[in-house]
Amino acid sequence: MGPLQFRDVAIEFSLEEWHCLDTAQRNLYRNVMLENYSNLVFLGIVVSKPDLIAHLEQGKKPLTMKRHEMVANPSVICSHFAQDLWPEQNIKDSFQKVILRRYEKRGHGNLQLIKRCESVDECKVHTGGYNGLNQCSTTTQSKVFQCDKYGKVFHKFSNSNRHNIRHTEKKPFKCIECGKAFNQFSTLITHKKIHTGEKPYICEECGKAFKYSSALNTHKRIHTGEKPYKCDKCDKAFIASSTLSKHEIIHTGKKPYKCEECGKAFNQSSTLTKHKKIHTGEKPYKCEECGKAFNQSSTLTKHKKIHTGEKPYVCEECGKAFKYSRILTTHKRIHTGEKPYKCNKCGKAFIASSTLSRHEFIHMGKKHYKCEECGKAFIWSSVLTRHKRVHTGEKPYKCEECGKAFKYSSTLSSHKRSHTGEKPYKCEECGKAFVASSTLSKHEIIHTGKKPYKCEECGKAFNQSSSLTKHKKIHTGEKPYKCEECGKAFNQSSSLTKHKKIHTGEKPYKCEECGKAFNQSSTLIKHKKIHTREKPYKCEECGKAFHLSTHLTTHKILHTGEKPYRCRECGKAFNHSATLSSHKKIHSGEKPYECDKCGKAFISPSSLSRHEIIHTGEKP
Protein backbone atom coordinates (compact mmCIF):
# COMPACT_ATOMS: atom_id res chain seq x y z
CA MET A 1 0.00 0.00 0.00
CA GLY A 2 1.62 3.27 -1.16
CA PRO A 3 1.79 6.69 0.46
CA LEU A 4 -1.53 8.51 0.81
CA GLN A 5 -2.00 11.46 -1.56
CA PHE A 6 -4.53 14.29 -1.78
CA ARG A 7 -6.06 12.89 -4.99
CA ASP A 8 -7.16 9.83 -2.96
CA VAL A 9 -9.65 12.02 -1.08
CA ALA A 10 -10.50 14.52 -3.85
CA ILE A 11 -13.84 14.51 -5.68
CA GLU A 12 -13.72 15.23 -9.42
CA PHE A 13 -16.31 16.64 -11.84
CA SER A 14 -16.29 16.47 -15.64
CA LEU A 15 -16.96 19.63 -17.65
CA GLU A 16 -20.55 18.53 -18.32
CA GLU A 17 -21.12 17.78 -14.63
CA TRP A 18 -19.63 21.10 -13.53
CA HIS A 19 -22.11 22.97 -15.76
CA CYS A 20 -24.97 21.07 -14.13
CA LEU A 21 -24.10 22.61 -10.73
CA ASP A 22 -25.60 25.93 -9.64
CA THR A 23 -23.59 28.59 -7.76
CA ALA A 24 -24.49 27.24 -4.31
CA GLN A 25 -23.44 23.72 -5.28
CA ARG A 26 -20.13 24.93 -6.73
CA ASN A 27 -19.44 26.82 -3.50
CA LEU A 28 -20.28 23.69 -1.56
CA TYR A 29 -17.76 21.72 -3.63
CA ARG A 30 -15.05 24.32 -2.98
CA ASN A 31 -15.75 24.30 0.77
CA VAL A 32 -15.63 20.50 1.00
CA MET A 33 -12.37 20.24 -0.96
CA LEU A 34 -10.75 22.91 1.21
CA GLU A 35 -12.05 21.19 4.34
CA ASN A 36 -10.72 17.80 3.21
CA TYR A 37 -7.32 19.36 2.56
CA SER A 38 -7.22 21.15 5.95
CA ASN A 39 -8.11 17.88 7.73
CA LEU A 40 -5.20 16.09 6.03
CA VAL A 41 -2.85 18.94 6.98
CA PHE A 42 -4.14 18.76 10.56
CA LEU A 43 -3.26 15.04 10.70
CA GLY A 44 0.17 15.65 9.16
CA ILE A 45 -0.67 13.56 6.10
CA VAL A 46 -0.20 16.35 3.51
CA VAL A 47 3.01 18.38 3.64
CA SER A 48 2.61 20.57 0.53
CA LYS A 49 -0.32 22.35 -1.12
CA PRO A 50 -1.81 20.73 -4.28
CA ASP A 51 -2.42 23.05 -7.25
CA LEU A 52 -6.15 22.26 -7.07
CA ILE A 53 -6.34 23.78 -3.60
CA ALA A 54 -4.34 26.83 -4.69
CA HIS A 55 -6.81 27.34 -7.59
CA LEU A 56 -9.84 26.94 -5.35
CA GLU A 57 -8.41 29.41 -2.81
CA GLN A 58 -8.00 31.93 -5.63
CA GLY A 59 -11.62 31.36 -6.77
CA LYS A 60 -10.63 29.68 -10.05
CA LYS A 61 -12.55 26.81 -11.68
CA PRO A 62 -11.24 23.34 -10.81
CA LEU A 63 -11.81 22.33 -14.45
CA THR A 64 -8.51 23.87 -15.53
CA MET A 65 -6.74 21.28 -13.37
CA LYS A 66 -5.47 17.99 -14.73
CA ARG A 67 -5.54 14.80 -12.73
CA HIS A 68 -1.76 14.62 -12.24
CA GLU A 69 -1.70 18.20 -10.94
CA MET A 70 -3.68 17.17 -7.86
CA VAL A 71 -0.73 15.20 -6.52
CA ALA A 72 1.03 16.80 -3.57
CA ASN A 73 4.59 15.94 -2.59
CA PRO A 74 4.59 12.40 -1.21
CA SER A 75 3.82 12.18 2.48
CA VAL A 76 6.12 10.42 4.90
CA ILE A 77 2.99 8.92 6.49
CA CYS A 78 1.68 5.91 4.59
CA SER A 79 -1.90 4.72 4.43
CA HIS A 80 -1.11 1.94 6.93
CA PHE A 81 -1.07 4.71 9.56
CA ALA A 82 -4.35 6.00 8.16
CA GLN A 83 -5.91 2.56 8.54
CA ASP A 84 -5.03 2.66 12.27
CA LEU A 85 -6.98 5.89 12.56
CA TRP A 86 -9.92 4.54 10.53
CA PRO A 87 -10.48 0.90 11.55
CA GLU A 88 -12.87 -0.99 9.28
CA GLN A 89 -12.92 1.65 6.56
CA ASN A 90 -10.65 3.38 4.09
CA ILE A 91 -9.47 6.97 4.62
CA LYS A 92 -10.65 7.93 1.16
CA ASP A 93 -14.22 6.88 1.94
CA SER A 94 -14.15 8.81 5.20
CA PHE A 95 -13.61 12.08 3.38
CA GLN A 96 -15.79 11.35 0.37
CA LYS A 97 -18.83 11.04 2.66
CA VAL A 98 -18.65 14.77 3.38
CA ILE A 99 -20.26 15.87 0.10
CA LEU A 100 -23.33 13.69 0.68
CA ARG A 101 -23.58 14.70 4.34
CA ARG A 102 -23.46 18.37 3.38
CA TYR A 103 -26.23 17.83 0.81
CA GLU A 104 -28.36 16.04 3.41
CA LYS A 105 -28.07 19.05 5.72
CA ARG A 106 -29.65 21.23 3.04
CA GLY A 107 -33.00 19.45 3.69
CA HIS A 108 -35.12 17.08 1.67
CA GLY A 109 -36.66 19.71 -0.61
CA ASN A 110 -33.40 21.43 -1.51
CA LEU A 111 -31.35 18.27 -2.05
CA GLN A 112 -30.13 18.10 -5.65
CA LEU A 113 -28.03 15.24 -6.97
CA ILE A 114 -26.46 15.15 -10.45
CA LYS A 115 -27.25 12.31 -12.86
CA ARG A 116 -24.39 10.92 -14.95
CA CYS A 117 -24.55 12.79 -18.29
CA GLU A 118 -23.46 11.57 -21.70
CA SER A 119 -23.39 15.12 -23.08
CA VAL A 120 -24.19 18.69 -22.05
CA ASP A 121 -27.58 18.50 -23.82
CA GLU A 122 -28.59 15.36 -21.95
CA CYS A 123 -27.52 16.71 -18.54
CA LYS A 124 -30.39 16.91 -16.04
CA VAL A 125 -30.68 17.81 -12.40
CA HIS A 126 -32.49 15.25 -10.25
CA THR A 127 -34.60 16.82 -7.47
CA GLY A 128 -36.35 13.80 -6.08
CA GLY A 129 -34.92 14.12 -2.56
CA TYR A 130 -34.25 11.00 -0.51
CA ASN A 131 -36.89 8.95 -2.30
CA GLY A 132 -35.09 9.43 -5.61
CA LEU A 133 -31.74 8.17 -4.48
CA ASN A 134 -32.49 4.70 -5.86
CA GLN A 135 -33.27 6.17 -9.31
CA CYS A 136 -29.92 7.76 -10.13
CA SER A 137 -26.20 7.49 -9.57
CA THR A 138 -24.03 10.40 -8.42
CA THR A 139 -20.73 11.54 -9.84
CA THR A 140 -18.71 9.82 -7.13
CA GLN A 141 -20.78 6.75 -6.18
CA SER A 142 -22.60 4.09 -8.19
CA LYS A 143 -24.55 2.06 -5.62
CA VAL A 144 -27.06 2.89 -2.91
CA PHE A 145 -27.00 1.38 0.61
CA GLN A 146 -29.72 1.93 3.21
CA CYS A 147 -29.56 1.93 7.04
CA ASP A 148 -31.79 -0.85 8.44
CA LYS A 149 -32.53 1.10 11.63
CA TYR A 150 -33.62 4.51 10.32
CA GLY A 151 -33.66 4.09 6.53
CA LYS A 152 -30.84 6.59 5.91
CA VAL A 153 -29.38 6.27 2.39
CA PHE A 154 -25.66 5.94 1.48
CA HIS A 155 -23.80 5.67 -1.83
CA LYS A 156 -20.91 3.55 -0.58
CA PHE A 157 -20.98 0.47 1.59
CA SER A 158 -18.19 1.95 3.76
CA ASN A 159 -20.30 5.05 4.40
CA SER A 160 -23.25 2.84 5.35
CA ASN A 161 -21.01 0.67 7.51
CA ARG A 162 -19.53 3.73 9.23
CA HIS A 163 -23.03 5.13 9.87
CA ASN A 164 -24.12 1.86 11.47
CA ILE A 165 -21.37 2.26 14.08
CA ARG A 166 -23.51 5.06 15.57
CA HIS A 167 -26.15 2.48 16.53
CA THR A 168 -23.57 0.31 18.30
CA GLU A 169 -21.40 1.18 21.28
CA LYS A 170 -18.21 1.02 19.20
CA LYS A 171 -15.88 4.01 19.46
CA PRO A 172 -13.02 3.20 17.10
CA PHE A 173 -11.54 6.72 16.83
CA LYS A 174 -9.21 7.36 19.76
CA CYS A 175 -7.45 10.58 20.74
CA ILE A 176 -3.70 10.00 21.12
CA GLU A 177 -3.47 12.99 23.50
CA CYS A 178 -5.98 11.99 26.21
CA GLY A 179 -7.28 8.55 25.22
CA LYS A 180 -10.89 9.63 24.75
CA ALA A 181 -12.72 7.62 22.05
CA PHE A 182 -15.40 8.60 19.53
CA ASN A 183 -17.68 6.81 17.05
CA GLN A 184 -17.00 9.30 14.23
CA PHE A 185 -13.73 10.58 12.84
CA SER A 186 -15.14 14.10 12.38
CA THR A 187 -15.91 14.22 16.11
CA LEU A 188 -12.30 13.26 16.86
CA ILE A 189 -11.06 16.10 14.59
CA THR A 190 -13.34 18.53 16.46
CA HIS A 191 -12.18 17.18 19.84
CA LYS A 192 -8.47 17.63 19.03
CA LYS A 193 -8.91 21.41 19.00
CA ILE A 194 -9.34 21.23 22.79
CA HIS A 195 -5.69 20.17 23.10
CA THR A 196 -4.29 22.55 20.49
CA GLY A 197 -6.28 25.52 21.82
CA GLU A 198 -7.02 26.49 18.21
CA LYS A 199 -9.92 28.95 17.83
CA PRO A 200 -10.13 29.79 14.12
CA TYR A 201 -13.70 31.15 14.10
CA ILE A 202 -13.83 34.82 15.16
CA CYS A 203 -16.91 36.99 15.76
CA GLU A 204 -16.72 40.18 13.68
CA GLU A 205 -19.00 41.96 16.17
CA CYS A 206 -17.01 41.54 19.41
CA GLY A 207 -13.81 39.68 18.42
CA LYS A 208 -14.55 36.59 20.53
CA ALA A 209 -12.99 33.40 19.09
CA PHE A 210 -14.39 29.87 18.97
CA LYS A 211 -13.12 26.36 18.25
CA TYR A 212 -16.12 25.47 16.12
CA SER A 213 -18.07 27.29 13.40
CA SER A 214 -21.35 26.07 14.93
CA ALA A 215 -20.43 27.74 18.23
CA LEU A 216 -19.72 31.00 16.38
CA ASN A 217 -23.08 30.82 14.59
CA THR A 218 -24.88 30.32 17.91
CA HIS A 219 -22.88 33.15 19.52
CA LYS A 220 -23.81 35.60 16.74
CA ARG A 221 -27.45 35.33 17.82
CA ILE A 222 -26.53 37.09 21.07
CA HIS A 223 -25.77 40.21 19.01
CA THR A 224 -28.76 39.86 16.65
CA GLY A 225 -31.20 38.86 19.39
CA GLU A 226 -32.41 35.97 17.22
CA LYS A 227 -33.93 33.05 19.15
CA PRO A 228 -35.17 30.55 16.54
CA TYR A 229 -35.81 27.62 18.89
CA LYS A 230 -39.14 28.00 20.70
CA CYS A 231 -40.66 25.83 23.44
CA ASP A 232 -44.15 24.54 22.56
CA LYS A 233 -45.16 24.43 26.23
CA CYS A 234 -44.31 27.94 27.49
CA ASP A 235 -43.26 29.85 24.32
CA LYS A 236 -39.82 30.56 25.78
CA ALA A 237 -37.26 30.95 22.98
CA PHE A 238 -33.56 30.02 22.80
CA ILE A 239 -30.57 30.72 20.59
CA ALA A 240 -29.51 27.06 20.43
CA SER A 241 -31.46 23.83 19.85
CA SER A 242 -29.42 22.11 22.58
CA THR A 243 -30.58 24.70 25.12
CA LEU A 244 -34.20 24.12 24.05
CA SER A 245 -33.78 20.35 24.48
CA LYS A 246 -32.46 20.83 28.02
CA HIS A 247 -35.28 23.27 28.80
CA GLU A 248 -38.02 20.91 27.61
CA ILE A 249 -37.05 18.38 30.29
CA ILE A 250 -38.24 20.92 32.91
CA HIS A 251 -41.84 20.51 31.68
CA THR A 252 -41.72 16.72 32.00
CA GLY A 253 -40.78 16.99 35.68
CA LYS A 254 -38.42 14.04 35.26
CA LYS A 255 -35.19 14.03 37.25
CA PRO A 256 -33.55 10.71 36.38
CA TYR A 257 -30.01 11.61 37.48
CA LYS A 258 -29.63 11.14 41.25
CA CYS A 259 -26.62 11.93 43.46
CA GLU A 260 -25.59 8.87 45.47
CA GLU A 261 -23.97 11.11 48.09
CA CYS A 262 -26.94 13.28 49.15
CA GLY A 263 -29.89 11.96 47.13
CA LYS A 264 -30.48 15.16 45.18
CA ALA A 265 -31.93 14.52 41.70
CA PHE A 266 -31.35 16.39 38.42
CA ASN A 267 -32.93 16.47 34.98
CA GLN A 268 -29.57 16.55 33.19
CA SER A 269 -26.52 14.29 33.60
CA SER A 270 -24.20 17.29 33.12
CA THR A 271 -25.82 19.04 36.11
CA LEU A 272 -25.27 15.93 38.24
CA THR A 273 -21.60 15.81 37.15
CA LYS A 274 -21.16 19.46 38.21
CA HIS A 275 -23.00 18.82 41.48
CA LYS A 276 -20.74 15.89 42.43
CA LYS A 277 -17.76 18.25 42.56
CA ILE A 278 -19.35 19.90 45.61
CA HIS A 279 -18.85 16.65 47.53
CA THR A 280 -15.38 15.88 46.17
CA GLY A 281 -14.16 19.47 46.53
CA GLU A 282 -12.55 19.17 43.10
CA LYS A 283 -11.75 22.53 41.46
CA PRO A 284 -9.81 21.83 38.26
CA TYR A 285 -10.36 25.22 36.57
CA LYS A 286 -7.88 27.83 37.84
CA CYS A 287 -7.74 31.57 37.06
CA GLU A 288 -4.28 32.57 35.77
CA GLU A 289 -4.85 36.15 36.95
CA CYS A 290 -5.53 35.60 40.67
CA GLY A 291 -5.13 31.85 41.22
CA LYS A 292 -8.74 31.28 42.30
CA ALA A 293 -10.03 27.80 41.36
CA PHE A 294 -13.48 26.66 40.27
CA ASN A 295 -15.30 23.36 39.82
CA GLN A 296 -16.83 24.41 36.47
CA SER A 297 -15.19 25.90 33.36
CA SER A 298 -18.23 28.15 32.82
CA THR A 299 -17.76 29.64 36.30
CA LEU A 300 -14.11 30.38 35.49
CA THR A 301 -15.17 32.09 32.23
CA LYS A 302 -17.63 34.26 34.18
CA HIS A 303 -15.00 35.00 36.85
CA LYS A 304 -12.46 36.24 34.29
CA LYS A 305 -14.75 39.15 33.44
CA ILE A 306 -14.08 40.51 36.95
CA HIS A 307 -10.47 41.15 35.89
CA THR A 308 -11.32 42.54 32.43
CA GLY A 309 -14.24 44.64 33.70
CA GLU A 310 -16.11 43.80 30.49
CA LYS A 311 -19.86 44.53 30.64
CA PRO A 312 -21.26 44.21 27.10
CA TYR A 313 -24.94 43.80 28.01
CA VAL A 314 -26.70 47.13 28.67
CA CYS A 315 -30.26 47.67 29.95
CA GLU A 316 -32.16 50.04 27.65
CA GLU A 317 -34.45 51.04 30.53
CA CYS A 318 -31.89 52.32 33.06
CA GLY A 319 -28.52 52.05 31.26
CA LYS A 320 -27.08 49.56 33.74
CA ALA A 321 -24.48 47.23 32.19
CA PHE A 322 -23.86 43.55 32.93
CA LYS A 323 -21.17 40.97 32.28
CA TYR A 324 -23.65 38.30 31.20
CA SER A 325 -26.76 38.34 28.97
CA ARG A 326 -28.73 36.11 31.36
CA ILE A 327 -28.23 38.62 34.20
CA LEU A 328 -29.53 41.38 31.94
CA THR A 329 -32.59 39.24 31.14
CA THR A 330 -33.22 38.72 34.87
CA HIS A 331 -32.57 42.41 35.61
CA LYS A 332 -35.18 43.53 33.06
CA ARG A 333 -37.85 41.84 35.18
CA ILE A 334 -37.22 44.44 37.90
CA HIS A 335 -38.61 47.03 35.47
CA THR A 336 -41.46 44.85 34.14
CA GLY A 337 -42.37 43.37 37.53
CA GLU A 338 -42.46 39.90 35.97
CA LYS A 339 -41.90 37.01 38.41
CA PRO A 340 -42.26 33.81 36.36
CA TYR A 341 -40.81 31.36 38.89
CA LYS A 342 -43.37 30.37 41.55
CA CYS A 343 -42.90 28.17 44.62
CA ASN A 344 -45.34 25.23 44.68
CA LYS A 345 -45.26 25.11 48.50
CA CYS A 346 -46.05 28.71 49.51
CA GLY A 347 -46.89 30.48 46.24
CA LYS A 348 -44.06 33.01 46.53
CA ALA A 349 -42.81 34.16 43.11
CA PHE A 350 -39.30 35.13 41.96
CA ILE A 351 -37.66 36.85 39.00
CA ALA A 352 -34.94 34.17 38.67
CA SER A 353 -35.05 30.37 38.68
CA SER A 354 -31.88 30.29 40.81
CA THR A 355 -33.63 32.36 43.52
CA LEU A 356 -36.57 29.93 43.47
CA SER A 357 -34.18 26.96 43.77
CA ARG A 358 -32.52 28.51 46.82
CA HIS A 359 -35.93 29.34 48.31
CA GLU A 360 -37.21 25.76 47.91
CA PHE A 361 -34.47 24.50 50.25
CA ILE A 362 -36.14 26.46 53.06
CA HIS A 363 -39.14 24.12 52.87
CA MET A 364 -36.88 21.05 52.82
CA GLY A 365 -35.18 22.14 56.04
CA LYS A 366 -31.99 20.20 55.18
CA LYS A 367 -28.68 21.82 56.11
CA HIS A 368 -25.85 19.72 54.69
CA TYR A 369 -23.04 22.28 54.98
CA LYS A 370 -21.62 22.74 58.50
CA CYS A 371 -19.03 25.25 59.71
CA GLU A 372 -16.14 23.47 61.45
CA GLU A 373 -15.33 26.63 63.41
CA CYS A 374 -18.65 27.25 65.18
CA GLY A 375 -20.88 24.31 64.17
CA LYS A 376 -23.46 26.46 62.40
CA ALA A 377 -25.13 24.63 59.49
CA PHE A 378 -26.30 25.99 56.15
CA ILE A 379 -28.54 24.91 53.28
CA TRP A 380 -26.05 26.02 50.58
CA SER A 381 -22.28 25.61 50.28
CA SER A 382 -21.99 29.18 48.95
CA VAL A 383 -23.54 30.55 52.16
CA LEU A 384 -21.09 28.48 54.22
CA THR A 385 -18.19 29.93 52.19
CA ARG A 386 -19.47 33.45 52.89
CA HIS A 387 -20.04 32.63 56.57
CA LYS A 388 -16.44 31.48 57.03
CA ARG A 389 -15.29 35.05 56.37
CA VAL A 390 -16.87 36.01 59.70
CA HIS A 391 -14.18 33.89 61.39
CA THR A 392 -11.29 34.77 59.07
CA GLY A 393 -12.14 38.48 58.81
CA GLU A 394 -11.40 38.29 55.08
CA LYS A 395 -12.74 41.22 53.04
CA PRO A 396 -11.72 40.59 49.42
CA TYR A 397 -14.09 43.10 47.77
CA LYS A 398 -12.75 46.67 47.89
CA CYS A 399 -14.44 49.92 46.81
CA GLU A 400 -12.24 51.87 44.36
CA GLU A 401 -13.99 55.10 45.33
CA CYS A 402 -13.33 55.19 49.10
CA GLY A 403 -11.18 52.10 49.76
CA LYS A 404 -13.74 50.43 52.01
CA ALA A 405 -13.56 46.61 51.92
CA PHE A 406 -16.37 44.08 52.15
CA LYS A 407 -16.80 40.37 52.76
CA TYR A 408 -19.26 39.95 49.90
CA SER A 409 -19.39 41.20 46.30
CA SER A 410 -23.13 41.92 46.67
CA THR A 411 -22.43 44.23 49.62
CA LEU A 412 -19.82 46.08 47.56
CA SER A 413 -22.32 46.49 44.70
CA SER A 414 -24.90 47.97 47.09
CA HIS A 415 -22.24 50.18 48.71
CA LYS A 416 -21.15 51.66 45.36
CA ARG A 417 -24.63 53.11 44.98
CA SER A 418 -24.01 55.30 48.03
CA HIS A 419 -21.41 57.12 45.89
CA THR A 420 -23.50 57.22 42.70
CA GLY A 421 -26.79 57.96 44.46
CA GLU A 422 -28.47 55.24 42.38
CA LYS A 423 -31.59 53.70 43.96
CA PRO A 424 -33.05 51.24 41.44
CA TYR A 425 -35.50 49.50 43.79
CA LYS A 426 -38.68 51.53 44.26
CA CYS A 427 -41.64 50.86 46.57
CA GLU A 428 -44.91 50.84 44.62
CA GLU A 429 -46.84 51.77 47.77
CA CYS A 430 -45.10 55.00 48.78
CA GLY A 431 -42.52 55.64 46.03
CA LYS A 432 -39.53 55.37 48.37
CA ALA A 433 -36.41 54.04 46.61
CA PHE A 434 -33.59 51.85 47.89
CA VAL A 435 -30.08 50.82 46.86
CA ALA A 436 -30.72 47.11 47.48
CA SER A 437 -33.64 44.80 46.66
CA SER A 438 -33.36 43.20 50.12
CA THR A 439 -33.88 46.62 51.74
CA LEU A 440 -36.98 47.15 49.59
CA SER A 441 -38.35 43.75 50.64
CA LYS A 442 -37.88 44.64 54.31
CA HIS A 443 -39.48 48.05 53.77
CA GLU A 444 -42.56 46.61 52.04
CA ILE A 445 -43.47 44.74 55.23
CA ILE A 446 -44.07 48.14 56.91
CA HIS A 447 -47.06 48.76 54.61
CA THR A 448 -48.63 45.39 55.47
CA GLY A 449 -48.56 46.25 59.18
CA LYS A 450 -47.58 42.67 59.98
CA LYS A 451 -45.22 42.05 62.90
CA PRO A 452 -44.89 38.27 63.08
CA TYR A 453 -41.69 38.21 65.18
CA LYS A 454 -42.49 38.63 68.90
CA CYS A 455 -40.11 38.90 71.85
CA GLU A 456 -40.95 36.30 74.51
CA GLU A 457 -39.28 38.45 77.19
CA CYS A 458 -41.27 41.69 76.85
CA GLY A 459 -43.89 40.96 74.17
CA LYS A 460 -42.60 43.55 71.71
CA ALA A 461 -43.26 42.56 68.07
CA PHE A 462 -41.16 43.17 64.95
CA ASN A 463 -41.68 42.88 61.21
CA GLN A 464 -38.25 41.33 60.67
CA SER A 465 -36.57 38.38 62.38
CA SER A 466 -33.22 40.23 62.32
CA SER A 467 -34.76 43.10 64.31
CA LEU A 468 -36.01 40.64 66.93
CA THR A 469 -32.55 39.04 67.16
CA LYS A 470 -30.98 42.47 67.74
CA HIS A 471 -33.67 43.37 70.28
CA LYS A 472 -33.11 40.22 72.36
CA LYS A 473 -29.57 41.35 73.15
CA ILE A 474 -31.06 44.23 75.19
CA HIS A 475 -32.49 41.69 77.64
CA THR A 476 -29.43 39.43 77.72
CA GLY A 477 -26.99 42.34 77.92
CA GLU A 478 -24.84 40.52 75.36
CA LYS A 479 -22.32 42.78 73.62
CA PRO A 480 -20.01 40.58 71.56
CA TYR A 481 -18.58 43.34 69.35
CA LYS A 482 -15.76 45.23 71.12
CA CYS A 483 -13.84 48.31 69.96
CA GLU A 484 -10.08 47.67 70.01
CA GLU A 485 -9.42 51.40 70.34
CA CYS A 486 -11.39 52.21 73.52
CA GLY A 487 -12.78 48.87 74.68
CA LYS A 488 -16.42 49.85 74.26
CA ALA A 489 -18.68 46.90 73.41
CA PHE A 490 -21.77 46.72 71.22
CA ASN A 491 -24.56 44.24 70.63
CA GLN A 492 -24.44 44.74 66.86
CA SER A 493 -21.48 44.64 64.47
CA SER A 494 -22.97 47.56 62.50
CA SER A 495 -22.96 49.67 65.68
CA LEU A 496 -19.27 48.90 66.20
CA THR A 497 -18.50 49.85 62.58
CA LYS A 498 -20.28 53.18 63.05
CA HIS A 499 -18.52 53.76 66.39
CA LYS A 500 -15.03 53.24 64.94
CA LYS A 501 -15.47 56.33 62.76
CA ILE A 502 -15.49 58.45 65.95
CA HIS A 503 -11.83 57.48 66.49
CA THR A 504 -10.77 57.91 62.86
CA GLY A 505 -12.66 61.18 62.42
CA GLU A 506 -13.69 59.95 58.99
CA LYS A 507 -16.74 61.74 57.57
CA PRO A 508 -17.09 60.64 53.94
CA TYR A 509 -20.77 61.58 53.52
CA LYS A 510 -21.21 65.28 52.76
CA CYS A 511 -24.44 67.30 52.39
CA GLU A 512 -24.53 69.15 49.05
CA GLU A 513 -26.97 71.68 50.52
CA CYS A 514 -24.96 73.00 53.49
CA GLY A 515 -21.60 71.17 53.28
CA LYS A 516 -21.99 69.39 56.62
CA ALA A 517 -20.22 66.00 56.67
CA PHE A 518 -21.19 62.78 58.40
CA ASN A 519 -19.55 59.47 59.19
CA GLN A 520 -22.61 57.46 58.15
CA SER A 521 -24.69 57.58 54.97
CA SER A 522 -27.87 56.98 57.00
CA THR A 523 -27.14 60.09 59.09
CA LEU A 524 -26.72 62.14 55.91
CA ILE A 525 -30.08 60.87 54.61
CA LYS A 526 -31.73 61.84 57.89
CA HIS A 527 -30.00 65.24 57.81
CA LYS A 528 -31.23 66.03 54.28
CA LYS A 529 -34.82 65.98 55.51
CA ILE A 530 -34.03 69.12 57.55
CA HIS A 531 -33.56 71.02 54.28
CA THR A 532 -36.60 69.51 52.57
CA ARG A 533 -38.68 69.84 55.78
CA GLU A 534 -40.17 66.49 54.83
CA LYS A 535 -41.96 64.75 57.71
CA PRO A 536 -43.50 61.57 56.29
CA TYR A 537 -43.95 59.75 59.61
CA LYS A 538 -47.10 60.83 61.47
CA CYS A 539 -48.36 59.79 64.93
CA GLU A 540 -51.93 58.44 64.74
CA GLU A 541 -52.47 59.33 68.41
CA CYS A 542 -51.71 63.07 68.35
CA GLY A 543 -50.98 63.89 64.70
CA LYS A 544 -47.38 64.98 65.29
CA ALA A 545 -45.11 64.34 62.28
CA PHE A 546 -41.42 63.37 62.17
CA HIS A 547 -38.54 63.26 59.72
CA LEU A 548 -37.56 59.74 60.72
CA SER A 549 -39.49 56.56 61.50
CA THR A 550 -37.24 55.98 64.55
CA HIS A 551 -38.31 59.34 65.96
CA LEU A 552 -41.96 58.34 65.55
CA THR A 553 -41.30 55.01 67.30
CA THR A 554 -39.57 56.85 70.14
CA HIS A 555 -42.44 59.36 70.35
CA LYS A 556 -45.14 56.67 70.56
CA ILE A 557 -43.71 55.42 73.85
CA LEU A 558 -44.73 58.78 75.39
CA HIS A 559 -48.37 57.84 74.82
CA THR A 560 -48.02 54.31 76.20
CA GLY A 561 -45.81 55.34 79.16
CA GLU A 562 -43.78 52.18 78.61
CA LYS A 563 -40.22 52.19 80.03
CA PRO A 564 -38.68 48.82 79.18
CA TYR A 565 -35.01 49.86 79.53
CA ARG A 566 -33.83 49.72 83.17
CA CYS A 567 -30.44 50.67 84.61
CA ARG A 568 -28.95 47.82 86.68
CA GLU A 569 -26.79 50.29 88.59
CA CYS A 570 -29.53 52.49 90.08
CA GLY A 571 -32.81 50.92 88.91
CA LYS A 572 -33.93 53.94 86.91
CA ALA A 573 -36.10 53.04 83.86
CA PHE A 574 -36.19 54.65 80.43
CA ASN A 575 -38.42 54.45 77.38
CA HIS A 576 -35.49 54.35 74.93
CA SER A 577 -32.36 52.19 74.84
CA ALA A 578 -30.30 55.19 73.66
CA THR A 579 -31.36 57.16 76.74
CA LEU A 580 -30.33 54.25 78.95
CA SER A 581 -26.95 54.07 77.21
CA SER A 582 -26.39 57.80 77.78
CA HIS A 583 -27.50 57.44 81.40
CA LYS A 584 -25.00 54.65 82.10
CA LYS A 585 -22.16 57.04 81.29
CA ILE A 586 -23.11 59.07 84.38
CA HIS A 587 -22.09 56.07 86.49
CA SER A 588 -18.98 55.30 84.47
CA GLY A 589 -17.93 58.95 84.04
CA GLU A 590 -17.31 58.28 80.36
CA LYS A 591 -17.51 61.29 78.01
CA PRO A 592 -16.47 60.05 74.56
CA TYR A 593 -17.86 62.96 72.50
CA GLU A 594 -15.39 65.87 72.46
CA CYS A 595 -15.79 69.33 70.90
CA ASP A 596 -13.16 70.10 68.23
CA LYS A 597 -13.31 73.82 69.05
CA CYS A 598 -12.87 73.96 72.83
CA GLY A 599 -12.15 70.39 73.93
CA LYS A 600 -15.20 70.06 76.16
CA ALA A 601 -16.49 66.46 76.39
CA PHE A 602 -20.01 65.06 76.56
CA ILE A 603 -21.70 61.76 77.33
CA SER A 604 -23.93 61.79 74.22
CA PRO A 605 -23.60 62.96 70.59
CA SER A 606 -26.83 64.96 70.91
CA SER A 607 -25.34 66.94 73.81
CA LEU A 608 -22.24 67.64 71.70
CA SER A 609 -24.42 68.75 68.75
CA ARG A 610 -26.32 71.19 70.97
CA HIS A 611 -23.02 72.50 72.36
CA GLU A 612 -21.49 73.06 68.90
CA ILE A 613 -24.23 75.59 68.08
CA ILE A 614 -22.57 77.93 70.63
CA HIS A 615 -19.50 78.14 68.39
CA THR A 616 -21.38 78.43 65.09
CA GLY A 617 -23.91 80.96 66.34
CA GLU A 618 -26.57 78.96 64.51
CA LYS A 619 -30.14 79.45 65.69
CA PRO A 620 -32.18 76.42 64.71
From Swiss-Prot:
GO terms for cellular component: nucleoplasm; nucleus. Residues 4-75 form the KRAB domain. InterPro entries: KRAB (IPR001909), KRAB_dom_sf (IPR036051), Znf_C2H2_sf (IPR036236), Znf_C2H2_type (IPR013087). Keywords: DNA-binding, Metal-binding, Nucleus, Repeat, Repressor, Transcription, Transcription regulation, Zinc, Zinc-finger. A zinc finger (C2H2-type) spans 145-167, 173-195, 201-223, 229-251, 257-279, 285-307, 313-335, 341-363, 369-391, 397-419, 425-447, 453-475, 481-503, 509-531, 537-559, 565-587, 593-615. Transcription factor specifically required to repress long interspersed nuclear element 1 (L1) retrotransposons: recognizes and binds L1 sequences and repress their expression by recruiting a repressive complex containing TRIM28/KAP1. Not able to repress expression of all subtypes of L1 elements. Binds to the 5' end of L1PA4, L1PA5 and L1PA6 subtypes, and some L1PA3 subtypes. Does not bind to L1PA7 or older subtypes nor at the most recently evolved L1PA2 and L1Hs. 50% of L1PA3 elements have lost the ZNF93-binding site, explaining why ZNF93 is not able to repress their expression. This is Zinc finger protein 93. The lineage of its organism: Eukaryota, Metazoa, Chordata, Craniata, Vertebrata.
